[in-house]
Amino acid sequence: MREIVHLQTGQCGNQIGAKFWEVVSDEHGIATDGQYKGNTDLQLERISVYYNEVAANKYVPRAVLIDLEPGTMDSVRSGAFGSLFRPDNFVFGQSGAGNNWAKGHYTEGAELVDSVLDVVRKEAEGCDCLQGFQITHSLGGGTGAGMGTLLISKIREEFPDRMMATFSVVPSPKVSDTVVEPYNATLSVHQLVENSDETFCIDNEALYDICFRTLKLATPTYGDLNHLVSIVMSGITTCLRFPGQLNSDLRKLAVNMVPFPRLHFFMVGFAPLTARGSQQYRAITVPELTSQMFDAKNMMAASDPRHGRYLTVAAYFRGKVSMKEVEENMLSVQNKNSNYFVEWIPNNVQTAHCDIAPRAHKMSVTFIGNSTAIQDLFKRVADQFTAMFRRKAFLHWYTGEGMDEMEFTEAESNMQDLVAEYQQYQEAHMDDEEAEEAYEDEAPPEE
Protein backbone atom coordinates (compact mmCIF):
# COMPACT_ATOMS: atom_id res chain seq x y z
CA MET A 1 0.00 0.00 0.00
CA ARG A 2 1.07 3.59 -0.52
CA GLU A 3 2.33 4.69 2.87
CA ILE A 4 2.78 8.19 4.26
CA VAL A 5 5.24 9.05 7.01
CA HIS A 6 4.00 11.84 9.28
CA LEU A 7 6.33 14.30 11.03
CA GLN A 8 5.36 16.91 13.59
CA THR A 9 7.83 19.57 14.70
CA GLY A 10 7.69 22.24 17.35
CA GLN A 11 4.95 23.05 19.83
CA CYS A 12 2.29 23.97 17.29
CA GLY A 13 3.09 21.03 15.01
CA ASN A 14 2.92 18.56 17.87
CA GLN A 15 -0.37 19.88 19.19
CA ILE A 16 -2.04 19.85 15.76
CA GLY A 17 -0.45 16.50 14.98
CA ALA A 18 -1.65 14.90 18.20
CA LYS A 19 -5.19 16.10 17.49
CA PHE A 20 -4.95 14.78 13.92
CA TRP A 21 -4.02 11.32 15.20
CA GLU A 22 -6.96 11.38 17.62
CA VAL A 23 -9.41 12.10 14.79
CA VAL A 24 -7.86 9.59 12.37
CA SER A 25 -7.64 6.85 15.00
CA ASP A 26 -11.27 7.44 15.83
CA GLU A 27 -12.28 7.18 12.15
CA HIS A 28 -10.34 3.95 11.74
CA GLY A 29 -11.66 2.42 14.95
CA ILE A 30 -8.32 2.33 16.73
CA ALA A 31 -8.40 2.65 20.51
CA THR A 32 -5.89 4.61 22.59
CA ASP A 33 -3.76 1.50 23.10
CA GLY A 34 -3.54 0.84 19.34
CA GLN A 35 -6.00 -2.08 19.35
CA TYR A 36 -8.49 -2.18 16.48
CA LYS A 37 -12.04 -1.90 17.86
CA GLY A 38 -13.79 -0.91 14.64
CA ASN A 39 -16.87 -2.36 12.97
CA THR A 40 -16.31 -2.26 9.21
CA ASP A 41 -13.70 -3.62 6.82
CA LEU A 42 -13.51 -0.24 5.09
CA GLN A 43 -11.63 1.03 8.13
CA LEU A 44 -8.89 -1.54 7.64
CA GLU A 45 -8.72 -1.63 3.86
CA ARG A 46 -6.13 1.14 3.53
CA ILE A 47 -5.11 1.49 7.14
CA SER A 48 -1.49 0.79 6.27
CA VAL A 49 -1.22 4.26 4.70
CA TYR A 50 -0.81 5.80 8.16
CA TYR A 51 -0.39 2.82 10.49
CA ASN A 52 2.04 -0.02 10.89
CA GLU A 53 0.52 -3.32 12.03
CA VAL A 54 2.96 -4.56 14.65
CA ALA A 55 1.00 -7.51 16.06
CA ALA A 56 -2.38 -9.07 15.46
CA ASN A 57 -4.82 -6.15 15.54
CA LYS A 58 -2.33 -3.71 17.06
CA TYR A 59 -1.56 -0.62 14.99
CA VAL A 60 1.12 2.02 15.49
CA PRO A 61 1.11 5.39 13.68
CA ARG A 62 3.94 6.06 11.23
CA ALA A 63 4.63 9.29 13.07
CA VAL A 64 7.83 11.00 14.13
CA LEU A 65 7.48 13.60 16.89
CA ILE A 66 10.19 16.24 17.06
CA ASP A 67 10.83 19.23 19.31
CA LEU A 68 13.81 21.11 20.69
CA GLU A 69 12.39 21.13 24.20
CA PRO A 70 10.73 18.30 26.11
CA GLY A 71 7.62 20.18 27.31
CA THR A 72 5.14 19.61 24.48
CA MET A 73 6.32 16.04 24.00
CA ASP A 74 5.63 15.28 27.64
CA SER A 75 2.08 16.56 27.34
CA VAL A 76 1.52 14.50 24.16
CA ARG A 77 2.95 11.46 25.88
CA SER A 78 0.80 11.91 28.95
CA GLY A 79 -2.30 12.68 26.85
CA ALA A 80 -5.04 10.18 25.94
CA PHE A 81 -3.25 8.91 22.83
CA GLY A 82 0.28 9.12 24.23
CA SER A 83 0.79 5.37 24.39
CA LEU A 84 -0.26 5.01 20.75
CA PHE A 85 3.07 6.30 19.40
CA ARG A 86 6.26 4.32 19.26
CA PRO A 87 8.45 5.55 22.16
CA ASP A 88 11.58 5.61 19.97
CA ASN A 89 9.85 8.03 17.61
CA PHE A 90 9.91 10.87 20.15
CA VAL A 91 13.02 12.87 19.28
CA PHE A 92 13.69 15.95 21.38
CA GLY A 93 16.40 18.31 22.55
CA GLN A 94 16.60 20.20 25.82
CA SER A 95 17.54 23.73 24.85
CA GLY A 96 14.56 25.04 22.89
CA ALA A 97 14.86 27.34 19.88
CA GLY A 98 13.43 30.41 21.59
CA ASN A 99 11.36 31.40 18.54
CA ASN A 100 14.62 31.87 16.66
CA TRP A 101 14.58 30.45 13.13
CA ALA A 102 18.37 30.40 12.97
CA LYS A 103 18.56 28.21 16.08
CA GLY A 104 16.11 25.74 14.59
CA HIS A 105 17.73 25.71 11.15
CA TYR A 106 21.44 26.12 11.78
CA THR A 107 22.51 25.47 15.37
CA GLU A 108 20.28 23.61 17.84
CA GLY A 109 18.12 21.97 15.17
CA ALA A 110 21.08 20.95 13.04
CA GLU A 111 22.49 18.98 16.00
CA LEU A 112 19.27 17.03 16.42
CA VAL A 113 18.48 16.51 12.74
CA ASP A 114 20.60 13.39 12.23
CA SER A 115 18.87 11.46 14.98
CA VAL A 116 15.51 12.51 13.48
CA LEU A 117 16.60 11.30 10.04
CA ASP A 118 17.57 7.93 11.55
CA VAL A 119 14.01 7.50 12.82
CA VAL A 120 12.57 8.70 9.49
CA ARG A 121 14.76 6.22 7.63
CA LYS A 122 13.59 3.44 9.91
CA GLU A 123 9.94 4.34 9.28
CA ALA A 124 10.55 4.55 5.53
CA GLU A 125 12.20 1.13 5.52
CA GLY A 126 9.11 -0.34 7.16
CA CYS A 127 7.01 0.81 4.19
CA ASP A 128 6.03 -1.30 1.23
CA CYS A 129 5.90 1.54 -1.24
CA LEU A 130 6.35 4.93 0.40
CA GLN A 131 4.38 7.67 -1.38
CA GLY A 132 5.67 10.60 0.63
CA PHE A 133 5.82 12.62 3.81
CA GLN A 134 3.54 15.07 5.54
CA ILE A 135 4.73 17.52 8.16
CA THR A 136 2.73 19.68 10.58
CA HIS A 137 4.45 22.83 11.82
CA SER A 138 4.04 26.56 12.29
CA LEU A 139 5.98 29.14 10.32
CA GLY A 140 6.23 31.75 13.06
CA GLY A 141 8.34 29.97 15.66
CA GLY A 142 11.85 28.58 15.86
CA THR A 143 11.53 24.80 15.90
CA GLY A 144 8.56 24.26 13.60
CA ALA A 145 9.73 26.89 11.14
CA GLY A 146 13.52 26.60 11.30
CA MET A 147 14.00 22.95 12.09
CA GLY A 148 10.87 21.95 10.18
CA THR A 149 12.22 23.44 6.95
CA LEU A 150 15.67 21.95 7.63
CA LEU A 151 14.05 18.51 7.93
CA ILE A 152 12.09 19.07 4.74
CA SER A 153 15.23 19.89 2.78
CA LYS A 154 17.18 16.95 4.29
CA ILE A 155 14.34 14.52 3.50
CA ARG A 156 14.16 16.02 0.01
CA GLU A 157 17.86 15.22 -0.43
CA GLU A 158 17.45 11.65 0.68
CA PHE A 159 14.08 10.88 -0.95
CA PRO A 160 14.08 13.17 -4.00
CA ASP A 161 11.24 11.40 -5.81
CA ARG A 162 8.76 11.19 -2.90
CA MET A 163 6.00 13.73 -2.29
CA MET A 164 6.30 16.32 0.46
CA ALA A 165 3.09 17.83 1.84
CA THR A 166 3.13 20.39 4.63
CA PHE A 167 0.37 21.65 6.91
CA SER A 168 1.75 25.06 7.78
CA VAL A 169 0.26 27.42 10.34
CA VAL A 170 0.99 30.90 9.01
CA PRO A 171 1.36 33.81 11.44
CA SER A 172 -1.72 35.98 11.38
CA PRO A 173 -1.98 39.76 11.67
CA LYS A 174 -4.11 39.93 14.80
CA VAL A 175 -3.02 36.86 16.74
CA SER A 176 0.71 37.22 17.24
CA ASP A 177 2.85 35.32 19.71
CA THR A 178 6.24 36.87 19.05
CA VAL A 179 7.58 39.97 17.42
CA VAL A 180 9.95 38.12 15.05
CA GLU A 181 7.20 36.05 13.37
CA PRO A 182 7.57 37.91 10.03
CA TYR A 183 11.28 37.01 9.92
CA ASN A 184 10.68 33.35 10.73
CA ALA A 185 7.77 33.08 8.29
CA THR A 186 9.61 34.72 5.38
CA LEU A 187 12.68 32.53 5.88
CA SER A 188 10.39 29.47 6.00
CA VAL A 189 8.40 30.36 2.89
CA HIS A 190 11.74 30.84 1.11
CA GLN A 191 12.41 27.15 1.89
CA LEU A 192 8.88 25.85 1.24
CA VAL A 193 8.70 27.41 -2.23
CA GLU A 194 11.69 25.30 -3.26
CA ASN A 195 11.24 22.10 -1.26
CA SER A 196 7.57 21.36 -0.65
CA ASP A 197 5.18 19.86 -3.21
CA GLU A 198 1.97 21.02 -1.59
CA THR A 199 1.48 23.37 1.35
CA PHE A 200 -1.87 23.71 3.09
CA CYS A 201 -1.96 27.19 4.65
CA ILE A 202 -3.84 27.57 7.90
CA ASP A 203 -3.87 30.66 10.00
CA ASN A 204 -4.94 31.38 13.53
CA GLU A 205 -6.86 34.56 12.79
CA ALA A 206 -9.08 32.83 10.25
CA LEU A 207 -9.64 29.98 12.70
CA TYR A 208 -10.59 32.47 15.45
CA ASP A 209 -13.03 34.15 13.08
CA ILE A 210 -14.67 30.83 12.25
CA CYS A 211 -14.99 30.05 15.96
CA PHE A 212 -16.52 33.47 16.73
CA ARG A 213 -18.74 33.97 13.71
CA THR A 214 -19.82 30.54 12.62
CA LEU A 215 -19.46 28.34 15.69
CA LYS A 216 -20.55 31.16 18.05
CA LEU A 217 -17.89 30.37 20.64
CA ALA A 218 -17.36 33.33 22.96
CA THR A 219 -13.82 32.44 24.03
CA PRO A 220 -12.22 29.98 21.62
CA THR A 221 -9.32 28.00 23.08
CA TYR A 222 -6.36 26.58 21.20
CA GLY A 223 -8.16 23.26 21.63
CA ASP A 224 -11.03 24.56 19.49
CA LEU A 225 -8.63 25.89 16.84
CA ASN A 226 -6.71 22.62 16.73
CA HIS A 227 -9.97 20.75 16.42
CA LEU A 228 -10.83 22.75 13.29
CA VAL A 229 -7.40 22.06 11.84
CA SER A 230 -7.71 18.36 12.57
CA ILE A 231 -11.12 18.16 10.84
CA VAL A 232 -9.60 19.70 7.72
CA MET A 233 -6.52 17.47 7.86
CA SER A 234 -8.77 14.46 8.25
CA GLY A 235 -10.81 15.64 5.24
CA ILE A 236 -7.79 16.27 3.04
CA THR A 237 -6.39 12.84 3.84
CA THR A 238 -9.72 11.00 3.43
CA CYS A 239 -8.96 9.99 -0.12
CA LEU A 240 -5.60 8.69 0.97
CA ARG A 241 -7.02 6.62 3.84
CA PHE A 242 -10.27 5.19 2.47
CA PRO A 243 -11.07 3.55 -0.84
CA GLY A 244 -12.81 6.02 -3.13
CA GLN A 245 -13.63 6.71 -6.75
CA LEU A 246 -11.11 9.48 -7.34
CA ASN A 247 -8.37 7.64 -5.57
CA SER A 248 -5.99 10.50 -4.91
CA ASP A 249 -2.62 9.81 -3.51
CA LEU A 250 -0.47 12.85 -2.74
CA ARG A 251 1.00 12.85 -6.23
CA LYS A 252 -2.36 12.79 -8.02
CA LEU A 253 -3.56 15.61 -5.80
CA ALA A 254 -0.48 17.64 -6.75
CA VAL A 255 -0.93 16.91 -10.45
CA ASN A 256 -4.50 18.20 -10.28
CA MET A 257 -3.73 21.21 -8.11
CA VAL A 258 -0.34 22.65 -9.06
CA PRO A 259 -0.21 24.32 -12.50
CA PHE A 260 3.25 25.86 -11.90
CA PRO A 261 5.70 24.25 -9.48
CA ARG A 262 6.19 27.29 -7.24
CA LEU A 263 2.48 27.99 -6.83
CA HIS A 264 1.65 25.17 -4.45
CA PHE A 265 0.16 27.07 -1.51
CA PHE A 266 -3.48 26.07 -0.94
CA MET A 267 -6.38 27.53 0.99
CA VAL A 268 -8.45 24.97 2.84
CA GLY A 269 -12.01 24.94 4.13
CA PHE A 270 -14.59 22.60 5.59
CA ALA A 271 -18.38 22.40 5.62
CA PRO A 272 -20.78 21.99 7.39
CA LEU A 273 -19.70 24.27 10.21
CA THR A 274 -22.65 25.19 12.41
CA ALA A 275 -22.96 26.46 15.95
CA ARG A 276 -23.61 23.66 18.43
CA GLY A 277 -26.99 25.04 19.42
CA SER A 278 -28.42 25.37 15.93
CA GLN A 279 -27.25 22.07 14.46
CA GLN A 280 -30.60 20.34 14.64
CA TYR A 281 -32.36 23.25 12.88
CA ARG A 282 -30.43 22.96 9.64
CA ALA A 283 -30.80 20.26 7.04
CA ILE A 284 -27.44 19.59 5.48
CA THR A 285 -27.95 19.35 1.73
CA VAL A 286 -25.50 19.26 -1.14
CA PRO A 287 -26.33 22.83 -2.33
CA GLU A 288 -25.90 24.04 1.25
CA LEU A 289 -22.51 22.32 1.51
CA THR A 290 -21.38 23.67 -1.84
CA SER A 291 -22.30 27.25 -1.05
CA GLN A 292 -20.75 27.13 2.42
CA MET A 293 -17.61 25.55 1.04
CA PHE A 294 -16.95 28.41 -1.40
CA ASP A 295 -17.87 31.04 1.18
CA ALA A 296 -14.97 33.37 2.00
CA LYS A 297 -15.79 33.17 5.72
CA ASN A 298 -15.09 29.46 5.57
CA MET A 299 -11.45 29.70 4.51
CA MET A 300 -8.92 28.73 7.13
CA ALA A 301 -6.34 31.20 5.84
CA ALA A 302 -6.91 34.93 6.20
CA SER A 303 -7.11 35.70 2.49
CA ASP A 304 -10.34 36.54 0.75
CA PRO A 305 -10.77 34.38 -2.38
CA ARG A 306 -12.87 37.19 -3.90
CA HIS A 307 -9.66 39.21 -4.22
CA GLY A 308 -8.21 36.71 -6.67
CA ARG A 309 -9.09 33.88 -9.01
CA TYR A 310 -8.96 30.14 -8.54
CA LEU A 311 -6.35 28.36 -10.60
CA THR A 312 -7.56 24.95 -9.41
CA VAL A 313 -9.97 23.56 -6.83
CA ALA A 314 -10.45 20.12 -5.31
CA ALA A 315 -13.52 19.19 -3.28
CA TYR A 316 -13.78 16.00 -1.24
CA PHE A 317 -17.34 15.03 -0.42
CA ARG A 318 -17.87 12.45 2.31
CA GLY A 319 -20.91 10.45 3.31
CA LYS A 320 -23.99 9.37 1.43
CA VAL A 321 -24.27 11.98 -1.31
CA SER A 322 -25.54 11.67 -4.85
CA MET A 323 -22.58 12.29 -7.14
CA LYS A 324 -24.93 13.53 -9.86
CA GLU A 325 -26.24 16.24 -7.54
CA VAL A 326 -22.69 17.12 -6.48
CA GLU A 327 -21.52 17.50 -10.08
CA GLU A 328 -24.54 19.67 -10.95
CA ASN A 329 -23.98 21.95 -7.96
CA MET A 330 -20.27 22.29 -8.61
CA LEU A 331 -20.99 23.19 -12.23
CA SER A 332 -23.57 25.78 -11.28
CA VAL A 333 -21.12 27.43 -8.86
CA GLN A 334 -18.56 27.63 -11.65
CA ASN A 335 -21.04 29.03 -14.15
CA LYS A 336 -22.40 31.68 -11.79
CA ASN A 337 -18.94 32.80 -10.68
CA SER A 338 -17.02 32.10 -13.85
CA ASN A 339 -14.85 35.20 -13.52
CA TYR A 340 -13.43 33.84 -10.26
CA PHE A 341 -12.00 30.80 -12.07
CA VAL A 342 -9.21 31.23 -14.61
CA GLU A 343 -10.50 30.31 -18.05
CA TRP A 344 -7.18 29.04 -19.37
CA ILE A 345 -7.33 25.89 -17.26
CA PRO A 346 -10.41 23.98 -18.41
CA ASN A 347 -11.97 21.51 -15.93
CA ASN A 348 -10.09 23.11 -13.08
CA VAL A 349 -12.53 21.93 -10.41
CA GLN A 350 -12.07 18.31 -9.37
CA THR A 351 -14.57 16.48 -7.18
CA ALA A 352 -13.86 13.34 -5.19
CA HIS A 353 -16.13 11.24 -3.04
CA CYS A 354 -15.65 8.91 -0.09
CA ASP A 355 -18.51 6.88 1.38
CA ILE A 356 -17.42 7.16 5.00
CA ALA A 357 -18.69 10.34 6.67
CA PRO A 358 -16.76 11.88 9.54
CA ARG A 359 -18.08 11.34 13.04
CA ALA A 360 -21.08 13.53 13.95
CA HIS A 361 -21.97 14.41 10.33
CA LYS A 362 -24.10 12.62 7.76
CA MET A 363 -22.18 14.30 4.99
CA SER A 364 -19.40 16.81 4.76
CA VAL A 365 -17.07 18.40 2.26
CA THR A 366 -13.44 19.48 2.44
CA PHE A 367 -12.26 22.25 0.16
CA ILE A 368 -8.76 22.75 -1.25
CA GLY A 369 -8.27 25.79 -3.44
CA ASN A 370 -5.22 27.08 -5.26
CA SER A 371 -6.22 30.73 -5.43
CA THR A 372 -4.17 33.73 -6.48
CA ALA A 373 -5.70 35.53 -3.48
CA ILE A 374 -3.26 33.70 -1.22
CA GLN A 375 -0.85 36.45 -2.20
CA ASP A 376 -2.63 38.66 0.38
CA LEU A 377 -1.21 36.44 3.06
CA PHE A 378 2.35 36.63 1.70
CA LYS A 379 2.07 40.38 1.08
CA ARG A 380 1.06 40.94 4.67
CA VAL A 381 4.02 38.98 6.02
CA ALA A 382 6.37 40.64 3.52
CA ASP A 383 5.27 44.12 4.58
CA GLN A 384 5.87 43.34 8.25
CA PHE A 385 9.21 41.77 7.33
CA THR A 386 10.31 44.85 5.38
CA ALA A 387 9.27 47.22 8.16
CA MET A 388 11.59 45.45 10.61
CA PHE A 389 14.37 44.54 8.22
CA ARG A 390 14.75 48.12 7.02
CA ARG A 391 15.77 49.03 10.57
CA LYS A 392 17.66 45.74 11.04
CA ALA A 393 15.55 45.20 14.15
CA PHE A 394 16.23 42.00 16.12
CA LEU A 395 18.70 40.92 13.46
CA HIS A 396 21.49 40.22 15.96
CA TRP A 397 19.56 37.19 17.25
CA TYR A 398 19.96 35.63 13.82
CA THR A 399 23.44 36.81 12.84
CA GLY A 400 24.61 35.65 16.27
CA GLU A 401 23.72 32.10 15.25
CA GLY A 402 25.85 32.45 12.12
CA MET A 403 23.29 33.69 9.62
CA ASP A 404 24.10 36.28 7.02
CA GLU A 405 22.05 39.37 6.19
CA MET A 406 22.21 38.27 2.58
CA GLU A 407 19.98 35.33 3.40
CA PHE A 408 17.28 37.70 4.63
CA THR A 409 17.50 39.76 1.46
CA GLU A 410 17.22 36.59 -0.63
CA ALA A 411 14.20 35.33 1.29
CA GLU A 412 12.54 38.73 0.97
CA SER A 413 12.97 38.88 -2.79
CA ASN A 414 11.85 35.26 -3.22
CA MET A 415 8.65 36.08 -1.36
CA GLN A 416 8.11 39.18 -3.52
CA ASP A 417 8.66 37.06 -6.64
CA LEU A 418 6.05 34.61 -5.40
CA VAL A 419 3.51 37.41 -4.93
CA ALA A 420 4.34 38.76 -8.40
CA GLU A 421 3.86 35.31 -9.95
CA TYR A 422 0.44 34.94 -8.36
CA GLN A 423 -0.47 38.42 -9.60
CA GLN A 424 0.72 37.62 -13.11
CA TYR A 425 -1.51 34.55 -13.38
CA GLN A 426 -4.43 36.39 -11.81
CA GLU A 427 -4.29 38.96 -14.60
CA ALA A 428 -3.56 36.48 -17.38
CA HIS A 429 -6.50 36.30 -19.78
CA MET A 430 -6.82 34.20 -22.86
CA ASP A 431 -6.80 36.24 -26.05
CA ASP A 432 -9.41 35.21 -28.60
CA GLU A 433 -6.80 33.80 -30.95
CA GLU A 434 -5.18 31.87 -28.12
CA ALA A 435 -8.54 30.53 -27.05
CA GLU A 436 -9.27 29.30 -30.56
CA GLU A 437 -5.84 27.69 -30.81
CA ALA A 438 -6.25 26.05 -27.41
CA TYR A 439 -9.62 24.76 -28.49
CA GLU A 440 -8.17 23.38 -31.71
CA ASP A 441 -5.33 21.73 -29.79
CA GLU A 442 -7.80 20.11 -27.45
CA ALA A 443 -10.14 18.77 -30.11
CA PRO A 444 -9.08 15.19 -30.81
CA PRO A 445 -8.28 14.47 -34.45
CA GLU A 446 -11.00 12.64 -36.34
CA GLU A 447 -10.08 9.04 -36.99
Curated annotation (Swiss-Prot):
* Cofactors: Mg(2+)
**Where is this chain compositionally biased, Acidic residues type?**
430-447
Record-linked InterPro entries: Beta-tubulin_BS (IPR013838), Beta_tubulin (IPR002453), Tub_FtsZ_C (IPR008280), Tubulin (IPR000217), Tubulin/FtsZ-like_C (IPR037103), Tubulin/FtsZ_2-layer-sand-dom (IPR018316), Tubulin/FtsZ_GTPase_sf (IPR036525), Tubulin_C (IPR023123)
One Gene Ontology cellular component annotation held by this UniProt entry: cytoplasm
Q: Where in the cell is it found?
A: Cytoplasm, Cytoskeleton
> Where does this protein chiefly localize?
cytoplasm
Question: A GO molecular function for this record?
Answer: GTP binding
Region spans: Disordered: 427-447
Q: Does the keyword Transmembrane helix apply?
A: no
Q: Where does GTP bind?
A: Q11, E69, S138, G142, T143, G144, N204, N226
GO terms for biological process?
A: microtubule-based process
The residues listed in the UniProt record as binding Mg(2+), with positions renumbered to this chain, are E69
> By its UniProt entry, which Pfam families does this protein fall under?
Tubulin (PF00091), Tubulin_C (PF03953)
Q: Which domain of life is it from?
A: Eukaryota
Concerning CDD domains, the annotation shows: beta_tubulin
What keywords tag this UniProt record? Answer: Cytoplasm, Cytoskeleton, GTP-binding, Magnesium, Metal-binding, Microtubule, Nucleotide-binding
Q: Does the record bear Cytoplasm in its keywords? A: yes
**Stated role:** Tubulin is the major constituent of microtubules, a cylinder consisting of laterally associated linear protofilaments composed of alpha- and beta-tubulin heterodimers. Microtubules grow by the addition of GTP-tubulin dimers to the microtubule end, where a stabilizing cap forms. Below the cap, tubulin dimers are in GDP-bound state, owing to GTPase activity of alpha-tubulin.
Spell out the subunit comment.
Dimer of alpha and beta chains. A typical microtubule is a hollow water-filled tube with an outer diameter of 25 nm and an inner diameter of 15 nM. Alpha-beta heterodimers associate head-to-tail to form protofilaments running lengthwise along the microtubule wall with the beta-tubulin subunit facing the microtubule plus end conferring a structural polarity. Microtubules usually have 13 protofilaments but different protofilament numbers can be found in some organisms and specialized cells.
The entry sums up its family as follows:
Belongs to the tubulin family.
Q: What is this protein called?
A: Tubulin beta chain
Where does this protein come from, organism-wise?
Uromyces fabae (Rust fungus)
Taxonomic classification: Eukaryota, Fungi, Dikarya, Basidiomycota, Pucciniomycotina
